[in-house]
Amino acid sequence: MDSSSCLVDDTNSGGSSTDKLRALAAAAAETAPLERMGSGASAVVDAAEPGAEADSGSGGRVCGGGGGGAGGAGGKLPSSKFKGVVPQPNGRWGAQIYERHQRVWLGTFAGEDDAARAYDVAAQRFRGRDAVTNFRPLAEADPDAAAELRFLATRSKAEVVDMLRKHTYFDELAQSKRTFAASTPSAATTTASLSNGHLSSPRSPFAPAAARDHLFDKTVTPSDVGKLNRLVIPKQHAEKHFPLQLPSAGGESKGVLLNFEDAAGKVWRFRYSYWNSSQSYVLTKGWSRFVKEKGLHAGDVVGFYRSAASAGDDGKLFIDCKLVRSTGAALASPADQPAPSPVKAVRLFGVDLLTAPAPVEQMAGCKRARDLAATTPPQAAAFKKQCIELALV
């Protein structure tokens, strides 16, 4: 009995052990594919694991739920091959330079090369001609490079940074070259003039102004020079001279940047856009600085011009302003002001009684004096005042 019972127990225990082994083998077979890593394809990395990142040098990368770009979750922006250029999340490129361990931001640019050129300009101004640049450094042997070096030497670091941020550096550089060339006659012209027995005067830097086509004038309103910081362009002129491609959905237009040159050769950069809310074309960014520097007030006239086709400036835009001041007594010329009435005096008991009325500004704080001046003739009022002063003596 004992031996048979032991055999039964061994048989039962052996069967249960076999079942357990089979169950463990099946479980291992099911979980084995999930534990495989690097089987000739891309590795599967848990995105929720902190610090997990695929190798940038691997052939590919699989992210759960779809493909990821360079700026995707857990990814890094591509570095630039240029010095002083940093990528932006929106696909644009930024430029920066360090001055005394402080970062100086030079602006954001559409292309990587444009940002690299902006850095080179700042490096030439901040660190001199020996600065390390991305492209070929400026040299005195090249006339264009020498002109740019001269331009940088006459501008402060803050001015150069401001021009780079507003994307007006190359426009102002071109204007500086034209002005310098106009004020300095060439050697050939000087030699030819001397051979003819006379020296011709250099061409005025503002001579191309005669080759401009007048577009339109705008009389600024109080809101144009107020706190709204915008200039409304009349719709008929805006659609004719500055057409914009408006969004089909009727939304707000981001607009474009327009460069205008004033009479002094300074380049002004304005953002020109369409406001769907007010259905108007406006100049916004940069306009408040123009108003402040030019001293514009309501009633002044701003003129817009474009270079003529024969000038060869490819439709260059110009801006001018005419200040219209009040013709009141405070600003009137001395010839327009009436001559003061002669002062008459009457001598009574050894005292000179003046007949000239008191100035109005002296009576501004006295209501009785103002009422007296309004109801009493000037001579009678002056005589009465003198009599009162005499009685009080």
UniProtKB/Swiss-Prot annotation:
One of its GO terms (cellular component) is nucleus. SMART domains: AP2, B3. Keywords: DNA-binding, Nucleus, Transcription, Transcription regulation. The keyword Transcription regulation applies. One of its GO terms (molecular function) is DNA binding. Its main location: nucleus. It holds the Pfam family AP2. It is found in: Nucleus. PROSITE patterns: AP2_ERF, B3. Residues 57-75 have a biased composition (Gly residues). Residues 81-136, 216-327 bind DNA. It comes from the Eukaryota. The keyword Transit peptide does not apply. This is AP2/ERF and B3 domain-containing protein Os01g0693400. It comes from Oryza sativa subsp. japonica (Rice). The lineage of its organism: Eukaryota, Viridiplantae, Streptophyta, Embryophyta, Tracheophyta.
